[in-house]
From Swiss-Prot:
Xref: InterPro entries: DUF1328
Pfam families: DUF1328 (PF07043)
Keywords: Cell membrane, Membrane, Transmembrane, Transmembrane helix
HAMAP family for this protein: UPF0391
Protein location: Cell membrane
Name the record gives this protein: UPF0391 membrane protein Bcep18194_C7021
Location (main, coarse): membrane
Statement: the UniProt record of this protein carries the keyword NAD: no
Family membership noted in the UniProt record: Belongs to the UPF0391 family.
UniProt topology in membrane: Multi-pass membrane protein
Annotated Gene Ontology cellular component terms: plasma membrane
Length: 53
């Protein structure tokens, strides 16, 4: 349990560095691009799963 607390604390520190620095806008753009890529991958795998039945 303590291990997870330390991991989430480190993630929070990294997020704070990006959020309070000037990098937030660039990271948001990258996140948007990755979101759409993963939505497309999800839809493709969903369709492949339906077709294989």
């Amino acid at each position: 349990m303590l291990r997870y607390a330390v991991i989430f604390f480190i993630i929070a520190i990294v997020a704070a560095v990006f959020g309070f620095g000037g990098i937030a806008a660039g990271a948001a753009e990258i996140a948007k691009i990755l979101f759409y890529i993963f939505v497309v991958i999800f839809l493709v795998t969903l369709l492949l799963g339906v077709v294989r039945r």
